[in-house]
Amino acid sequence: MATATVLEKANIGVFTNTKHDLWVADAKPTLEEVKNGQGLQPGEVTIEVRSTGICGSDVHFWHAGCIGPMIVTGDHILGHESAGQVVAVAPDVTSLKPGDRVAVEPNIICNACEPCLTGRYNGCENVQFLSTPPVDGLLRRYVNHPAIWCHKIGDMSYEDGALLEPLSVSLAGIERSGLRLGDPCLVTGAGPIGLITLLSARAAGASPIVITDIDEGRLEFAKSLVPDVRTYKVQIGLSAEQNAEGIINVFNDGQGSGPGALRPRIAMECTGVESSVASAIWSVKFGGKVFVIGVGKNEMTVPFMRLSTWEIDLQYQYRYCNTWPRAIRLVRNGVIDLKKLVTHRFLLEDAIKAFETAANPKTGAIKVQIMSSEDDVKAASAGQKI
């Protein structure tokens, strides 16, 4: 086992449970285990996690205790958007060395089932996805993980490295939706995934792009990211079809939504909310597509006959596969800039406050990052690379 860096701080993690408690406590592997290489399996490396983003699913596991069939059944560590430094490697690992900066792709697959063997490993029948019960997540100071799922990020900041996970979600959607250069595109929802999808759609050449949300502040934030994006504030009292008319009106510079009006070929649905999915369906052109990235309730009602008579494809996404190298290139080469998305930063020991901030709409939080040291928090907040 090769090691680097003087390790001094104990391992702690951010836990929830069936009672919806949230706390910070000692976590595995222990500091002594990390120093001595105990528990490091063949093919694994130990990572000192330096930055982790809070995902909406983390908040949902805390508040609701489940997402569909994925249920918290005991003490459970959250977090799956992380980057850090390799501090130890198993003897058989040759692709990484202590000191390497990496982003963690948070899955472990079986490499034996049909999805794995056909390259769609996000559908692995035996997947262990970090932070999805019962598999503990990355919100801890040290973690062991297979080297094959640790992607070198070079001189990229750990903060950007942690944002590669939500970017991968967006890239998977853009690719599978078939979005083309010059396509009119609708993005529903200006949360973190919607905003990253907006950046990705712009990079892919979509034009014009309209983004929707119920929060005017988030729409203003979207315009700060992509100044020429058009925005539509969803009206709560209107039907899905009526909101769609408003969306089409925005696509047409206020000239209405009647026959001949420009409609999006692709709608990237990033909320998972039934009314938003329905509005997207009512918005797209004949032969268009509604691509659902957002996670919603187990069952929902959609305008079936609109889908049928307008030949609209309704397509879904589950996580991602084979996206991380591309995501790294896009960020490293400046094609997609994610820095503005981070609005709040907290120390690992202050994770409860971080989660409260992420969960409260009044804070204006977009992406909340949790970092392993006070120096990292101060440096990142000052715009310095960590």
UniProtKB/Swiss-Prot annotation:
Residue numbers binding NAD(+): P192, I193, D213, R218, I293, Q317, Y318, R319
Catalysed reactions listed for this entry: L-arabinitol + NAD(+) = L-xylulose + NADH + H(+)
CDD domains: sorbitol_DH
Influence of temperature on activity: Optimum temperature is 40-50 degrees Celsius.
Binding site for Zn(2+) 2: C110, C113, C116, C124
This enzyme's EC code(s): 1.1.1.12
Keyword Transmembrane attached: no
Extent of the signal sequence: none
Necessary cofactors: Zn(2+)
Free-text remark on how the cofactor is bound: Binds 2 Zn(2+) ions per subunit.
EC class (word): oxidoreductase
Annotated keywords: Arabinose catabolism, Carbohydrate metabolism, Metal-binding, NAD, Oxidoreductase, Zinc
PANTHER family (alphabetical): L-ARABINITOL 4-DEHYDROGENASE (PTHR43161:SF12), SORBITOL DEHYDROGENASE (PTHR43161)
Family assignment from sequence similarity: Belongs to the zinc-containing alcohol dehydrogenase family.
Protein's name according to its UniProt entry: L-arabinitol 4-dehydrogenase
